[in-house]
Regions:
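Bacterial N-terminal signal peptides
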Residues: 8-18
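Secreted glycan hydrolases and related glycan-binding modules that recognize and/or cleave
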Residues: 3, 14-15, 28-30
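Exported/periplasmic ABC-transporter solute-binding proteins
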Residues: 20-58, 63, 67-68, 72, ...
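Periplasmic-binding protein-like
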Residues: 84-89
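Short, glycine-/small- and polar/acidic-enriched structural segments
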Residues: 110, 117
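A short, gly/pro- and small-residue-rich
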Residues: 101-108
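Bacterial N-terminal signal peptides that target proteins for export
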Residues: 1-9
Length: 271
């Protein structure tokens, strides 16, 4: 009898203890945030990082994740099936490539900002490059983006315009290209090599010379008649898992608030 009462008492105590213990969830609570993946040209890095934070602040529960690279690399990644919600390219050609992959809908991409080219040198300018004719001097080292990269193609267009003008000679383009020692996969790599003094000069966008970068390089402006006004298109990816949110983000890029950020970083606002 004693052992029976003891057993009953022990069972009762265990039951009470179990009832008082906090109930633990079987699994952790799911993360309620939504991640929006934006593929964007490397030249948009600084401006889009700020715009992304502003968009998150205006849309609680949304996290914007960027994939910055050369537009040609991003178009290739889209063609290979990389998950994405938005694509912002530095030219229409790579947007067309993305459309041809079937990931984008033709006619939905629109220009949201513009840019222009500038020649840069290291801050101490060891080669003493002062003007466009100096780019053709023998023995200097230049860094361009690869021709597949929008800014690389724009640089070639600039050289063609100079040759067509005729005043710097029919062989100007050939002389300049003979000085190119490296072709980079995005514009940020060109900027970095020149800023580090690994090259005497290069061609980037004016937007790449932000306050920080401007302390590390000098600029040589390219006259309007030789320059290229680069048009940047943006569109939602057709198979986005968050298509409504992707369209909301692309629409936000056209708002005055977002356009002001782009202008702050050296871009040309759309009119």
């Amino acid at each position: 009898m004693f052992y029976r009462l003891t057993s009953l008492l022990l069972c009762g105590l265990l039951f009470v203890a179990a009832g008082c213990a906090p109930i633990q969830p079987a699994t952790p609570a799911a993360d309620s945030s939504t991640t929006l993946t934006v593929f964007a040209a490397a030249s948009l890095t600084d401006a889009f990082n700020e715009i992304g934070k502003n968009f998150e602040a205006a849309n609680p529960g949304v996290k914007v994740v960027f994939n910055f690279a050369g537009s040609q690399q991003l178009a290739q990644q889209l063609g290979q099936g990389a998950p994405a919600d938005v694509f912002a390219s530095a030219n229409g050609k790579q947007m067309d490539v993305a459309i041809d992959t079937g990931r984008m809908i033709s006619g939905t991409a629109h220009t949201f900002v513009r840019n222009r080219l500038v020649v840069i040198t290291p801050k101490d300018n060891p080669a003493q490059l002062k003007s466009l004719p100096d780019l053709a001097k023998s023995g200097i080292k230049l860094v361009f983006a690869a021709k597949e990269v929008p800014v690389g193609q724009y640089a070639l267009d600039f050289l063609d315009k100079v040759v067509k003008d005729g005043r710097l000679g029919a062989d100007y383009k050939d002389k300049v290209l003979a000085n190119v020692v490296s072709n980079e996969q995005d514009v940020k790599a060109v900027l970095a090599k020149v800023a580090l003094g690994e090259a005497d000069g290069g061609i980037v966008y004016t937007s790449d010379i932000t306050a920080a970068a401007g302390t590390k390089v000098q600029r040589i402006d390219i006259p309007d008649k030789f320059n290229t006004i680069a048009a940047y298109p943006i569109a939602a990816v057709k198979d986005s898992k968050h298509l409504d949110l992707a369209n909301t983000f692309t629409a936000y890029i056209f708002t005055p608030a977002a356009q002001q950020v782009l202008v702050k970083y050296g871009f040309i606002a759309i009119k």
